[in-house]
């Protein structure tokens, strides 16, 4: 009986000691938020507090471009007619110098939400350019007729106003036959700057095959949303390019620190529409 009691007593003593150590570490961690001990390393990497809006800290200073992304869910029986009508109207707006806007890209979703069109517009001059463009469109009888006709074809639509990350290249027209992937991330509120800090270092791992098209974050619409736009020759090329990134030292660290910042993520594989500057 005595032989059994002594090991149990020893185990209880060891457990009591470990509990005290753990309690001390926890107290220390919560009492001193600036201390980066072992507990804080279990969570997202900390960044310094900022005293400015993330739109000023993360966007490009030398340009004042504003972007708008549109998601149109089309009635299946109208998909072909919708594409043809959009092609005609967007082409005119894109080439009309009287309107301070241009189509960056237009796509149909291939994998993801079906019977969907995605349009990305750029407004050179920021919010004043957007306001001026909308004012002129509301006076354009041809556009108003298009909008009325288009409304019959849609199930729903939504849009977001975006700024581009300073460390991404600005989207430029592409020739050839490509597929595009739009990866959208809903971040935890307050983590946009941290996301930008990590991706500013990580983007170098994803540029060797010219796959990086553009990176954006929302200003109006769904907030704390990030969109990364990628181009690949085909799905097999996408698979090989993404796999190659994991072989580069440092990419895994970037993924490790950005994953805890994400609430939700979504991937769309998209096919360019006929008039899209990004082909």
UniProtKB/Swiss-Prot annotation:
Keywords: Autophagy, Mitochondrion, Transit peptide. The keyword Transit peptide applies. Disruption phenotype: Morpholino knockdown of the protein causes impaired mitophagy. GO terms for biological process: mitophagy. This is Protein NipSnap homolog 1. Its main location: mitochondrion. Protein involved in mitophagy. Accumulates on the mitochondria surface in response to mitochondrial depolarization and acts as a 'eat me' signal by recruiting proteins involved in selective autophagy. The keyword Repeat does not apply. It is found in: Mitochondrion matrix. One of its GO terms (molecular function) is protein-macromolecule adaptor activity. GO terms for cellular component: mitochondrial matrix; mitochondrion. Belongs to the NipSnap family.
